[in-house]
Every structure is written in C-alpha cells, then in structure tokens.
C-alpha cells in the first residue's frame, strides 16, 4: 500500500478514490428520488453515477498497480469491484430505458457496498497484501471477477424486481407478452399487431407501464447474472481441482453459491416454462438478493471456510 504524508497526515490514494466514489453516489441518490417525483432531471444522477464508476475504475487500476495482482484478493477490494460492476450494470440498464426509477432503485446498492467498504471495514482489511500461494493463479481473474460481475447483475436485477412492488403497490398486472418476450428490452415506442384485425397494416403503438419495464429489465439483468454465475461456478470447480485435488468440497461459500444458483434457476424456470410474470417471479428474485448477501457478506465476515476473507476471527 502506498501512503502519502502531508503534515503528519497520511492517506491511501486507493481508499481516497473509494471515498470520492461514495460521495458522488451519495449526491446521485437524492437526485434520483427527486427525478422520480418529477422535481429533477434523471440525467444528472446518471452523470454522477458515471463519474463514480470512473473513480472506481481508477481505484481498481491503481490497486492493481500497487499490489501486482488483480484487485479482488480481500473483502475491501471485492466490495469495490462489486460496486464498480453495479454502477456499470446500472448505466447499461439506464441506456436501455431512460427512467429515473432505475437509478432510484439501483443507486442504493452501490452506495451501501462502497460505504461498507470505506467506512465499516477496519484499515487492515483495506490494505493490500501478498497473495497466498493458492491464489497465485490465472484462475483468480477468471473465477472471482466473473463471480463478482454475476453478483452485480443479480443484485441489480433483484432490486429492480423489488421496484415492481414499489411502483404498482397492490395492483395486479399481466405482462402483455410471453416470458421470453417480456425479457426483451421494450421501449414505449414499440409496435404491436392488433390480433383483432387480420389486416397487417393495423399496427398500433403501445405504452408499457413502469412495472412492465422494470420487470423486463430485471429479467434481462438476472439472466445475464445467472449465466455469469454458472461460468463462475464451473471455473471455480476447475480451479479447486487444480489447487486442492477436489472439484467440490462443500465449503460454506460453495454451498451458499449453489443455493444462490438454484434460487435464480427457479426464477428463470418459472418465467420460461411456467409463464410466471410480474410479482410472482419477483418474490424469488428478492429471495435471491438475501441469499447473495449471506453468501458474500455473511460467510466472509464470519471468516468461515477457504473462501472467506475474514474479519471477526482474523482481525
């Protein structure tokens, strides 16, 4: 870790960049809520999130240069990488649907993640350290980075599913297409064929509700996250076999990662084969959100198993 001294005050530039990212997300949060209420322009919040993502990118690059290895070797680095992934996913989703609702429901996830890393973790966990021999492998980037990106996509998708309840309250709605179709990015200017008229010229515009848009974006985000999680689990099994001679050891992190995979597999199964849409699959997505929290934060902080980054027992 590189520290700069100024009048007997030392600071780590990596941690400082994390603070800067937190501040920009903190400014973006109320603007997002005001934009939902119609009192502000959501593009301002989007700009602040983009600036935060740039700070996080710079932070990860600087830590990589300092440590000599990809910056996902401890809890602090992985939280910063997770925040980077969440902000990037949010920007992509907002590009697909320019609505303040996306920013209002997604920004808190990134803010809590970088806030926890910057203000809750002790200094010894914020510092870089040499990799243990088992982690000195090219699989580190392949496995851990893919897993963290999957967590980012799944967390954002789950929060968007929760937004379905916030937007529609107790109302019931049905997505006006199939589970495959509802997963597509839909814009309000899309066209649909009036089935009551056999004339192919009878094409009319249809306005999709906020709940339908949220459901659509959530479905896509969770699908991407599930695919990444699958790749991450497979690469982790291959790496484990090379490092420890076992494909699967039922380590607490492995077990909870499998539970996470099963929950989101059930989500996709109910949408694709059972035709569930709207609030029913959203319940599974929200359950998956809490499973990720236990898998990632809970196991790590308890310092249990080979995958934990430790805190209470190691600090």
Curated annotation (Swiss-Prot):
It comes from the Bacteria. The keyword Transmembrane helix applies. InterPro entries: Cyt_c_assembly (IPR002541), Cyt_c_biogenesis_CcmC (IPR003557), Cyt_c_biogenesis_CcsA (IPR017562), Cyt_c_biogenesis_CcsA/CcmC (IPR045062). Pfam families: Cytochrom_C_asm. GO terms for molecular function: heme binding; heme transmembrane transporter activity. It is found in: Cellular thylakoid membrane. The chain crosses the membrane at residues 17-37, 72-92, 101-121, 146-166, 221-241, 255-272, 282-302. May interact with ccs1. Required during biogenesis of c-type cytochromes (cytochrome c6 and cytochrome f) at the step of heme attachment. Belongs to the CcmF/CycK/Ccl1/NrfE/CcsA family. This is Cytochrome c biogenesis protein CcsA. It comes from Prochlorococcus marinus (strain NATL2A). The gene is ccsA.
């Amino acid at each position: 870790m590189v520290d700069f001294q100024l009048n007997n005050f030392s600071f780590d530039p990596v941690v400082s960049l994390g603070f800067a990212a937190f501040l920009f997300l903190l400014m973006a949060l109320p603007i997002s809520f005001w934009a939902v209420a119609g009192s502000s322009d959501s593009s301002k919040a989007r700009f602040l999130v983009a600036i935060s993502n740039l700070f996080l990118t710079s932070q990860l690059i600087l830590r990589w240069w300092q440590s000599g290895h990809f910056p996902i070797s401890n809890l602090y680095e992985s939280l910063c990488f997770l925040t980077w992934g969440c902000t990037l996913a949010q920007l992509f989703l907002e590009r697909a649907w320019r609505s303040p609702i996306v920013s209002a429901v997604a920004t808190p996830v990134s803010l809590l993640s970088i806030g926890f890393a910057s203000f809750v973790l002790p200094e010894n966990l914020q510092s870089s350290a040499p990799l243990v021999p088992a982690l000195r492998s090219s699989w580190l980037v392949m496995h851990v980075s893919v897993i963290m990106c999957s967590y980012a996509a799944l967390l954002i998708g789950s929060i968007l599913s929760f937004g379905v309840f916030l937007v529609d309250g107790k109302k019931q709605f049905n997505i006006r297409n199939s589970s495959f179709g509802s997963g597509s990015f839909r814009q309000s200017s899309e066209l649909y064929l009036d089935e009551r008229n056999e004339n192919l010229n009878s094409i009319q515009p249809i306005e999709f509700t906020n709940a339908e848009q949220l459901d659509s974006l959530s479905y896509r985000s969770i699908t991407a996250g599930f695919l990444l999680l699958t790749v991450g689990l497979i690469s982790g099994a291959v790496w484990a076999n090379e490092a420890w001679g076992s494909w699967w050891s039922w380590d607490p992190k492995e077990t909870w990662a499998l539970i996470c995979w099963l929950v989101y597999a059930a989500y996709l199964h109910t949408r694709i084969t059972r035709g569930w849409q709207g609030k029913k699959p959203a319940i599974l997505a929200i359950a998956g959100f809490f499973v990720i929290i236990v898998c990632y934060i809970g196991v790590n902080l308890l310092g249990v198993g080979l995958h934990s980054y430790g805190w209470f027992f190691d600090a």
